[in-house]
Amino acid sequence: MPAMPALVPAQPYYCEENAWHEAKRVVEAGEPGPIEVVFISNPARQCALWAQRAAPKPGEPVVWDYHVVVRVGGDILDPDCTAGARLPAAAWLAASFPHGEEIFSRYLPRFRRYPAGQFLMVFASDRRHMRRPDGTHLKPPPAWPPIVARDGSVHTLPAFLDFDTVGPTPWVGLRAFAAALATPGTD
């Protein structure tokens, strides 16, 4: 297989927008699939991931309210991962969740996959979740304009994180997600 183009520029703390741009790039490049956008969270919105650039120290986890990556065939694209921005799924899982499910239950991840084509049409973020009450940014925003859904919606992010909303796939635990990744193209 020929070498794939480099990842698109990414903005720290805006993983959902990074994933949108990366999914768009890989779809347009015609990379073999499946191509999915994967949301990682849990009902407590306290999900521990290791090997993340935002970690307080190397080897320590960062606790995200949510994280978003892109699956391309058997690879995971995660520009926040210190082990590599594009890794085989098993390597990304080992780096990001080195303790498996042997952590406090409140930090256990849940995963929901969205087909990239669907995600690219309906995702939108006006970045309101990244602003303080006075309107200032919690973290510097990306240079690109906010993403607007094809239907003109400006903020659909909450629906992607809702554990009560029916999505294209159910929220699943680490083992089920790893099993789905182990058989690219058959799930």
Segments predicted by a language model, with ranges:
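A structural boundary/capping signal
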Residues: 1-187
